[in-house]
UniProtKB/Swiss-Prot annotation:
One GO biological process term: rRNA base methylation
Protein name: Ribosomal RNA small subunit methyltransferase H
Highest taxon above the source species: Bacteria
Binding annotation for S-adenosyl-L-methionine: G35, G36, H37, D55, F79, D101, Q108
Gene3D superfamilies attached to this UniProt entry: Putative methyltransferase TM0872, insert domain, Vaccinia Virus protein VP39
Organism: Aliivibrio fischeri (strain MJ11)
Listed SUPFAM superfamilies: Putative methyltransferase TM0872, insert domain (SSF81799), S-adenosyl-L-methionine-dependent methyltransferases (SSF53335)
Gene: rsmH
EC number: 2.1.1.199
Function, as annotated: Specifically methylates the N4 position of cytidine in position 1402 (C1402) of 16S rRNA.
Lineage: Bacteria, Pseudomonadati, Pseudomonadota, Gammaproteobacteria, Vibrionales
NCBIfam families: 16S rRNA (cytosine(1402)-N(4))-methyltransferase RsmH
Record's catalysed reaction(s): cytidine(1402) in 16S rRNA + S-adenosyl-L-methionine = N(4)-methylcytidine(1402) in 16S rRNA + S-adenosyl-L-homocysteine + H(+)
C-alpha cells in the first residue's frame, strides 16, 4: 500500500469475529478499500476457503491486485451488485459471511485529487468511481435551489440547507465569479453563507459535503440493494457484519435487521388461514448481540473511527 495514503481498518477484529469465520467457508467483503478486512479474513481461511472482495474504486482494485493468495478474488464494481456477482459464481445460498464497511476510506479522504474533503484543496469531484457518473461540480452547476436544498437536508441533515443552497446558486449566477470547481471554493462559500451564530464543533461544510458525496454516488440506494442482496445469498447461519459511519447509514442497517428479524407483519384480526400465513414467510435473520462501538483506545489511535457502529446479524 502507498505510504502516502495509509488506511487503518475500523473495528477490524470485532467485525471479523462477528463473521465467525469457518476455515473452509466462502466469504464476501463488499468493500475492499485498502484490504484490511480482506487480509484478516484470508488469514483465517484454510486451503478450501474462499474470499471474494468487491470495490468500485480503481485505486482499491490496484491495491487488491497485489494480493496473490489463490483463495482471493477481486471484483471491480459497486457492492450493490453483490447478488448478481454471487449468482454468476453460482454460489447463492452458499455464502458463509458478508462484510460491508460503509463510507469513505481514509485514502480517499486524504487524497485531495478525489475531492472528498473540504480540509484539502482539490477538484470538486467526490465520485467513488471517477470513470462513471458526473462530478459534484457539474451537478452544482446545473441543479436549482430546491434540488440542492433537498440533497443537503435529506443526506446531510443540515438545518441551514436552504441558506447554503441559495448561496451556491447566487454565487454561480454572478458572472464575475470563477466556476465552482474546487473543494476549497465550496468550503469557503459555505462558511461565508452559514449563519454567524453557527457554533457547531464541526466545520460548517461538513454536512453539505457529506450530502453531496452520498447523492452523487447514490450511496443509500447502494446500501439498501447490498443489504437485500446479502440476505439473499447467505447460507443458513451465515453472518452479515456491517460497519456504518453516520446516522443515516446506521439507521438503514438497524431497520433492515429489525424488519428481517420480525418477518411479515399481519394486522391483528385479519382472517387468514394457516397456509396463507405460512405463504407470507417468516423471519429471515436474527441480530447477534448489540451494536458495537469503537473503544476509547481505538478512537485515540484513529479519530475517524469515533462515529462508527458495527451491527451483526445471522441468516436463519
Amino acid at each position: 500500500m502507498s505510504e502516502q495514503f495509509q488506511h487503518v481498518s475500523v473495528l477490524l477484529h470485532e467485525s471479523i469475529d462477528g463473521l465467525a469465520i469457518k476455515p473452509d467457508g466462502i466469504y464476501i467483503d463488499g468493500t475492499f478499500g485498502r484490504g484490511g478486512h480482506s487480509r484478516q479474513i484470508l488469514s483465517q481461511l484454510g486451503e478450501n476457503g474462499r474470499l471474494y472482495s468487491i470495490d468500485r474504486d480503481p485505486q482499491a482494485i490496484a491495491e487488491a491486485k497485489t494480493i496473490t493468495d489463490p483463495k482471493f478474488t477481486i471484483i471491480h464494481g459497486p457492492f450493490s451488485g453483490l447478488k448478481q456477482y454471487v449468482e454468476e459464481l453460482e454460489l447463492v445460498g452458499k455464502i458463509d459471511g458478508v462484510l460491508l464497511d460503509l463510507g469513505v476510506s481514509s485514502p480517499q479522504l486524504d487524497d485531495a485529487e478525489r475531492g472528498f474533503s473540504f480540509m484539502k484543496d482539490g477538484p470538486l469531484d467526490m465520485r467513488m468511481d471517477p470513470t462513471s457518473g458526473i462530478p459534484v461540480s457539474q451537478w452544482l452547476q446545473e441543479a436549482d435551489v430546491e434540488d440542492i436544498t433537498w440533497v443537503i437536508r435529506e443526506f446531510g441533515e443540515d438545518k441551514h440547507a436552504w441558506r447554503i443552497a441559495k448561496g451556491i446558486v447566487a454565487y454561480r449566477e454572478n458572472e464575475e465569479n470563477e466556476p465552482l470547481t474546487r473543494t476549497s471554493q465550496l468550503a469557503k462559500l459555505i462558511s461565508e453563507v452559514a449563519p454567524k451564530s453557527f457554533k457547531e464543533k464541526k466545520h460548517p461544510a461538513t454536512r453539505a459535503f457529506q450530502a453531496f458525496r452520498i447523492y452523487i454516488n447514490s450511496e443509500l440506494d447502494e446500501i439498501d440493494t447490498a443489504l437485500k442482496g446479502a440476505l439473499d445469498v447467505l447460507a443458513p447461519e451465515g453472518r452479515l457484519s456491517v460497519i456504518s459511519f453516520h446516522s443515516l447509514e446506521d439507521r438503514m442497517v438497524k431497520h433492515f435487521i429489525r424488519k428481517e428479524s420480525k418477518g411479515p407483519q399481519v394486522p391483528h384480526g385479519l382472517p387468514l388461514t394457516e397456509e396463507q400465513i405460512k405463504a407470507l414467510g417468516s423471519a429471515k435473520m436474527k441480530p447477534v448481540g448489540k451494536a458495537i462501538k469503537p473503544t476509547k483506545n481505538e478512537v485515540d489511535v484513529n479519530v475517524r473511527s469515533r462515529s462508527s457502529v458495527l451491527r451483526i446479524a445471522e441468516r436463519l
